[in-house]
Regions:
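Loop/turn-rich, solvent-exposed surfaces of beta-rich toroidal or solenoidal domains
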Residues: 8-9, 36-81
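Structural signature of eukaryotic scaffold interfaces centered on beta-propeller domains
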Residues: 1-4, 46-54, 96-108
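Repeat-based blade/solenoid architectures
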Residues: 37-47, 87-97, 136
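Short coil turn/linker residues within repeat-based beta-strand modules
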Residues: 27-29, 77-78, 126-128
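Beta-propeller fold detector
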Residues: 30-36, 80-87, 131-136
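Structural motif
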Residues: 15-22, 66-72, 117-131
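Blade-level signature of beta-propeller repeat domains, shared across WD40, Kelch, NHL, RCC1
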Residues: 91-136
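Beta-rich catalytic cores
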Residues: 2, 16, 42, 66, ...
Length: 136
């Protein structure tokens, strides 16, 4: 990728809180820790929403047994830009981002596993509107 980022969820519970650790694509830890103090539960699913050659958003699942939230960070600055929650989806281990336009999802969709058995789809257009994200 453009910034040589490899994101790994750190599920270890510590006084500092759980977070995402950034590595280079060859496996070297950069020292950057993302989302500490923002995650309420375990960091799980990770997806990159690429909106341009060097723009977009990292999406991280904050996995809760009762309800998840999906945290969005700017691809370039790695700054937190907001979160969304589904009304049902919980206990998500994995997410998948499909940026391809369809009739139902004109800007694509974010798919999340619900409780190890079903999938939920979130409209990327609705997410962008809710969080005030810039899309091409």
């Amino acid at each position: 990728p453009a910034y040589n980022h490899l994101m790994i969820g750190d599920e270890e519970i510590s006084a500092e809180g759980q977070a995402i650790k950034r590595y280079t694509s060859d496996g070297n830890f950069t020292g950057d820790v993302i989302g500490r103090g923002i995650f309420e539960n375990q960091p799980e699913g990770i997806a990159l929403w690429q909106t341009g050659e060097k723009t977009g958003y990292w999406i991280f699942t904050d996995q809760g047994i009762d309800l998840n939230q999906y945290l969005f960070f700017d691809r370039q600055s790695l700054e937190y830009v907001g979160a969304i929650k589904g009304t049902i989806t919980s206990n998500t281990d994995g997410i998948w981002l499909d940026p391809v336009s369809s009739l139902r999802f004109p800007k694509g969709a974010l798919y999340a596993i619900h409780d190890d058995g079903n999938a939920t789809a979130f409209s990327l257009a609705e997410i962008a509107d809710a969080l005030g994200l810039n899309l091409p």
